[in-house]
């Protein structure tokens, strides 16, 4: 039912009052102050700016319920979430996950990536639901693939510019 509705109506049509019980639960059960103050671990959440199409990475210190909601706002199901006057959708469109901030901010030697959606599929989707699912999968995976390619190119350039440098 929701699947069919989301193809015929936008979330602005079928949820005119913008009621979202998930936000209420997040605000009630997540201690954002504790998250912001916990400096033993870095946390980044990504959202996609609707106007520019660019990724915005929110660091641990700036994470709020709105940031969490924006980072998971699929545009065919949820309204864009406004943060500082700008509308945001799911961060998966532009950074799924955003790897470069982890490396550039922390100088991490290693990053563990857990892939939750396959980049490749052997079957050809034939139903409307499967086609939409695959389109979303490709869209969400393309940002990761682009970042991985950028890392490979960066390592290659470093090796050429600094022959004695060891890159893993």
Kindly give the residue locations of the regions a language model identified.
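A short alpha-helix-loop-beta-strand transition element characteristic
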Residues: 30-42
């Amino acid at each position: 039912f929701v699947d069919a509705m989301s193809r015929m109506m936008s979330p602005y049509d079928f949820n005119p009052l913008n009621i979202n019980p998930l936000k209420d639960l997040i605000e009630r059960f997540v201690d954002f102050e504790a998250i912001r103050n916990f400096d033993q671990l870095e946390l980044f959440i990504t959202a996609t700016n609707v106007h520019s199409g660019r990724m915005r990475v929110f660091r641990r210190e700036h994470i709020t319920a709105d940031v969490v909601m924006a980072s998971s706002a699929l545009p065919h199901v949820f309204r864009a979430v406004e943060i500082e006057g700008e509308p945001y959708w799911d961060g998966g469109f532009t950074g799924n996950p955003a790897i470069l901030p982890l490396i550039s901010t922390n100088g991490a030697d290693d990053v563990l990536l857990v892939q939750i959606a396959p980049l490749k599929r052997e079957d050809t989707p034939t139903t409307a639901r499967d086609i939409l699912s695959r389109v979303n999968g490709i869209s969400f995976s393309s940002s990761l693939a682009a970042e991985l390619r950028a890392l490979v190119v960066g390592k290659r350039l470093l090796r050429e510019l600094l022959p004695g440098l060891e890159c893993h």
